[in-house]
Amino acid sequence: MANIGLAFVNPAPLTKPAYVVNFAKKCEAMGVHSMWTIDRVAYDNLDSMILLAAAAGATQRIRIGTSVLLPGLRHPALLAKTIATLDFVSNGRVTIGVGFGSRENDFTAVEIPFDGRGSRAVECVQLMKRLWSEDNVTHKGRFYNVQNLTIGPRPIQKQIPIFTGGSAEAALKRAGTWANGFICGSSAIPEFSVTWEKVARYVRAAGRNPNEIEKAGLTFMAINDDHAKALEALNAYVVRYYGRQRGDVAATSLVGSPAAVAERIEAFLSRGLDTLIIGLADPD
């Protein structure tokens, strides 16, 4: 049976302090599988790790995760400790979706080069995996160097699930080679089976089992019986977040009346997804 996850994507000016905890509690009460959030620097979203820590404290069951975290913006030793702590206080409920970053201003803000961000993120993730499971880690890489480093706490989960996504061939290969899950963007959900077969080939080439890789999709939702108002809310969110309109986003999102949205959710899940992550574009 497929899972539904809900993503808290409100920018700070459009939310209130109580919303985060209330959102998490409602997710758990509704039987939702997971709660997710975004990760940016040069944008007025709430910090992803702190937001998820608040959600963890307000819940007992739901998984909490990022879709997606930008690991290349942080040193892997500090990020590994932060994520391990989040996994510890949530009693092993963390999933980390990682991305490589498409907005240069996020990198400029923390004085990290935009070029090489994909390789930097991959090296960060690989080093974090070692820091979560090994003592006295020594690593000499292109971007990071550590010497005899041991950090704590250890995560509750023996292996924190790491998801990645993308549509370029290199991104599909990364997902198939080392990720625990693949996140498909909304525009690619209608043809997910085609994309997944490409990922599965890389999974098999790496000596792994495609059935052990979780298949997730990310989309956005705006519900209103007045379709025009729902579409207005969706477009407003997209422009605010991406800085521009992105084609016919409504064609690959969940927009309209509750009945229309429910029908679209079923259609998306029929593409073979294990988890559908839904970002709520309407701040209400």
Language model regions located:
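Active-site-adjacent structural elements that line small-molecule/cofactor binding pockets in enzymes
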Residues: M1-D284
